[in-house]
Curated annotation (Swiss-Prot):
The gene is AIM39. The chain crosses the membrane at residues 86-106. The keyword Transmembrane applies. Its main location: mitochondrion. This is Altered inheritance of mitochondria protein 39, mitochondrial. GO terms for cellular component: mitochondrial membrane. Belongs to the AIM39 family. It is a single-pass membrane protein.
Length: 340
């Protein structure tokens, strides 16, 4: 830009100097650069500094070589960060575009199939859903849990010595369950995501599918909801063993001869649904936790599983002694750890 403008400016000077010799004298008086010193100073014969039309120049500040090197390094780093940001933004946009294009445009809109878009890992522990809570008799679970807990207490020597037999509270009443909570634990890890299906998809023969899931509709396109897809590691492992010609039963006989094939799967009673909470099994365990007050300074807490019957996992006595809360483990089930 500077050289181009300089060339035009020089040609104009030559024309004017030829047409009017007085212009040469006038230009010299106005300290104009002659034709032999375009890039040098005629007084010192040194190279002129480049023009700084768009730069802020402070002649009072003299930058050292280290400052210049640091400024160049910072400029290179800033440029590298910008390139990385652009690269990752483009890569993320591409991944999202391909995922949405395949899951929604191809599978849902074109193939008219249900699709699942994974987002984040799902929680392993969660509350009972409204549908699952109807299938579990919580009052019966509470009563059975209390009976199993009282059986452990009455057979424990320390409880007999401190509270006597039959077991009663400090007010002379029969111990009762003060607090009782129930929750679920997924057997397999899962992924939380978005379930998308065609807008004209219907399941008239499956009333539970409509009753337990709340779908959101985008008019003219599709329906979507949040769902969880289990990652069945055990099934994949069994499929791999069958592929190489090894039977799961033979493997269990080698690892633990006392364990029956498939006994673990009968521990959970819940959940029959599709692959995203709806035709395959999503294995769950029901856990419960209860509290029983024995006195103002003593409380029993118990925890266990429930399937057809109650199975206690641990019973503890929490007691206040010398202004300190002490925990006594009265019962702990070690069978699952030995068999696992």
């Amino acid at each position: 830009m500077y050289l181009a403008r300089s060339g035009v400016f020089i040609s104009r000077i030559r024309v004017l100097s030829i047409l009017n010799p007085r212009f040469v004298l006038l230009s010299r008086r106005l300290n104009h650069t002659d034709s032999k010193h375009y890039f040098t100073d005629p007084k010192t014969n040194e190279i002129k500094k480049p023009p700084t039309f768009f730069q802020h120049h402070d002649s009072k500040v003299n930058a050292s070589a280290d400052d210049v090197a640091q400024a160049i390094a910072e400029s290179v780093r800033a440029h590298k960060k910008r390139r990385q940001k652009v690269f990752f933004s483009a890569m993320l946009t591409g991944i999202i575009g391909v995922t949405l294009g395949f899951s929604i445009s191809y599978k849902v809109l074109y193939k008219k199939q249900e699709s699942f878009i994974p987002l984040v890992p799902s929680r392993k522990w969660h509350r009972l859903s409204a549908y699952d809570a109807q299938r579990v008799n919580i009052d019966e679970m509470k009563m059975l849990g209390k009976m199993r807990c009282l059986s452990v207490l009455t057979n424990h020597e320390m409880i007999r010595e401190q509270f006597g037999i039959p077991l009663k509270t400090d007010t002379g009443e029969v111990p009762s369950v003060k607090s009782f909570e129930v929750w679920c634990e997924d057997q397999d890890p899962g992924v939380l995501g978005i379930v998308v299906r065609p807008i004209d998809a219907t399941r008239d023969n499956d009333s539970r599918y409509h009753r337990t899931h709340g779908w959101h509709t985008i008019p003219g396109l599709f329906q979507w909801r949040m769902g969880t897809k289990p990652i069945k590691i055990r099934d994949k492992f069994d499929s791999f063993l069958k592929f190489i010609g090894v039977n799961t039963g033979d493997l269990l006989e080698v690892i633990n001869p006392d364990r029956e094939v498939g006994d673990f799967k009968y521990e959970y009673p819940l959940r029959k649904g599709d692959s995203f909470d709806g035709d395959d099994d999503r294995a769950m365990h029901i856990w419960f936790f209860g509290e029983i007050d024995l006195s103002q300074d003593a409380m029993v807490v118990f925890k266990g599983k429930y399937h057809v019957n109650v199975k206690l996992e641990q019973v503890d006595l929490l007691k206040k002694e010398n202004d300190q809360l002490i925990r006594y483990v009265l019962y702990k089930n070690e069978n699952d750890k030995k068999n696992g």
